[in-house]
Amino acid sequence: MWDGEKMAAAMVQMSCLYRGMLAVRNHGIRPLIPGLVPSHFRAFSMKKEPELEENPYYSKYEEKIRKLRSSKPQEYESRLEKRTELKTEPLGRSRQAEFVKYMEKELDKRGKDGDGGFTKDKTLGSILNLEMVQEKSGAEITELWMQYFSKKDTISAVIPSSTFDVIFGRAKSCPTFLYALPQNEGYEFFVGQWAGNELHFTSLINVQTMGENAPSQLILYHYTDLQKDKDIVLMTAEMDSKFVTVHQAQCLANQVQLFYGSQRLETFRLVETFNHKPEEFKHMAVIAELEQSGIGPAVTTK
């Protein structure tokens, strides 16, 4: 269980991030698919919280918020109170120091409990006949890999060994980052956390409402089994299709390449700042970088 004060601090800064999100508008990207409501969830009346409901993704996670308020009303009210305490925090800045510690603790717990609905200890051998591909070249394996996953509702990639070494080396010192997914109403923020060769994503509002129970919604698997002999690293993913589409998963994967694999040091410096100088981190800088790279739409700032 997390320390209460650190949890509260994390909740406060996440509230500030969402005020920043609401200032950005974009009309070219389709919205997330609303989550399906499990039949066993009990319906009950819930007091409306205007500030929370102003978040454009409130409806997407409303059922999870209802469940939290029903099962842990004191914790729910405490989080809302902490959200109010820092309304004066400057837009564009966030208290990430507490948040980074918060996500590290989540990773530790998630490593012990696993992620519901996702394959545990997924190996390359469970996907590919490793004996068969030993005689094939890296180019031939690349073609097989991409053809196989082109028929699946997921994403895949073949990463050059040198590129992966850069990405993974940086991930060791900077395992956590905040990603911005373009949506109809601004951007939805996702937290990406490396765990070995896996990269776990969960939406920021999901962490905010679910706390330590927030599950991964997208996992990128990187297989290094053939890196030494074939000079390639194979990647594929699993996702919760109720919350993340294939198109959106590809956008997040592209951002990993952008922020962790870029030769432009100013780009990776955002990741370093998030991890090592969180008090200086500006989430709007992430959005600006996406626009400059062409991954995100044009951003109008006031």
From Swiss-Prot:
Cellular compartments per GO CC: mitochondrial inner membrane; mitochondrion
Keywords in alphabetical order: Membrane, Mitochondrion, Mitochondrion inner membrane, Transit peptide
InterPro entries noted in UniProt: ATP11
Chief place where the protein resides: mitochondrion
Pfam families linked to this entry: ATP11
Presence of the UniProt keyword Mitochondrion in the record: yes
Protein name: ATP synthase mitochondrial F1 complex assembly factor 1
